[in-house]
Amino acid sequence: MSNYWVEREAKHIEEMLKRHVNYEQEIHRRYLQLWKTIEAEIQQFYVAYAGKEKISIDEAKRRVSKHDVQIFAEKAKRYVQTRDFSKEANEQLRLYNLTMKVNRLELLKSKIGLYLTDNTNQLQTYFTAILTEEAVAEFVRQAGILGESVLSEETYRLFAKAIIEGSFHNTTFSQRLWANQDVLKASIDRLLTVGLVAGKHPDILARELRKLVVIDSLRGKETADYVARRLMISESARIQSEVQKQSYEKYG
């Protein structure tokens, strides 16, 4: 391989790594915003039902008022109307609508679940857009390397869609993304219940919940933030590899 091609490939790898850094920063920003929303909801919960720094589990398990239910239902309706929820997101929301009327604690869990669903739905859209652009660009790049004519962008987008929606080890990227949310939701629900039983101060509970959602270092492998970042990078690498493979099979 000539120096030209070696240098060209090295530059491509360098640019790809820079993009990966940008992707991780954007995902982190989204989870940080999600956390701030969750924290505010927890603080509001304590203010509304405690009037002091502690709330008993008995108080938390009292039935919610019709007014509280109506407020949540209206908020959920606005999310559906303005966010273009996916099939997965609508299914999650249906479950929250079923459980929110049980008691105040379940209403809090449903509110947080709504924010999680919105975040994951937006991440799915973000992932799909980024991966599509990467796949199209790589198809064009491979056509240039192999000396073939560049096809239309529409054609490449169809190729990209098939790759992105394809499974890897019998699971698609979107399934992995929603599974990450399921793990996070279950962990938050469990911590909320245990925290209220123990009578934890809301600030302590908030700090413990933050460790599940977001962390300021990539060392925190248990956070949903970290898992989503790793998923994005691994999917980006998979897309690049699959486009190259298909290009070589077609033109090589």
Residue ranges and their predicted role:
Residues 206, 216-252:
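Acidic, glycine-rich two-metal-ion catalytic cores of nucleic acid-processing enzymes
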Residues 1-218:
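N-terminal leader/targeting and assembly helices and adjacent pre-domain segments
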